[in-house]
C-alpha cells in the first residue's frame, strides 16, 4: 500500500494528509485484532491468553510491520498485539497511534522504551481488557 502516516506530539496524526483517529471500540466480541511477530509469545505461558483473545474477537488479522498500526490509528482495526519487536520497529508508530487517540504499551502495560520487545496497542476502550486478558 502506498501511504504515508505522520504525527507530532500535540498535533494529531495523519494518513495520506487526512486526520485519523482510533476506533471507539469497547467490545472485544465486535473488535478486529491483528497480530504481527509473535514467535516468542508462542513459546510462553501467554500463548493461551492470546488464543482466548483471538477466539473472542470478531475478526483477526495478521498484517504485520507498520501496516496494522496504520489501520489501528485510522480506526479500521481495534488492536495490535506483537511479541518480537525492538524500539527501531515501533518508535514512530508509538507517536502515530497515541496522537490518533490510541493506547500503546508493552504486554505488561509499560510505556515503550529502549528495551521494549512486545506491544499491546489498542483503542482506549479495549486496551485495559486486553491487558487483563494477556495477564490471565
Task: Label the predicted regions.
Residues 1-14:
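DPxDG-like acidic metal-binding loop motif
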Residues 21-136:
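An extended, acidic
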Amino acid at each position: 500500500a502506498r501511504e504515508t502516516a505522520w504525527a507530532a506530539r500535540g498535533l494529531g496524526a495523519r494518513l495520506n494528509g487526512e486526520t485519523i483517529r482510533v476506533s471507539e471500540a469497547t467490545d472485544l466480541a465486535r473488535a478486529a485484532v491483528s497480530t504481527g511477530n509473535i514467535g516468542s509469545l508462542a513459546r510462553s505461558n501467554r500463548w493461551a491468553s492470546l488464543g482466548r483473545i483471538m477466539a473472542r474477537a470478531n475478526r483477526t488479522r495478521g498484517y504485520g510491520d507498520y501496516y496494522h498500526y496504520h489501520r489501528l490509528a485510522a480506526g479500521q482495526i481495534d488492536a495490535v498485539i506483537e511479541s518480537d519487536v525492538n524500539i527501531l520497529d515501533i518508535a514512530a508508530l508509538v507517536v502515530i497511534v497515541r496522537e490518533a487517540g490510541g493506547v500503546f504499551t508493552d504486554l505488561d502495560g509499560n510505556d515503550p522504551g529502549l528495551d521494549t520487545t512486545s506491544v499491546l496497542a489498542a483503542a482506549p476502550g479495549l486496551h485495559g481488557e486486553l491487558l487483563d486478558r494477556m495477564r490471565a
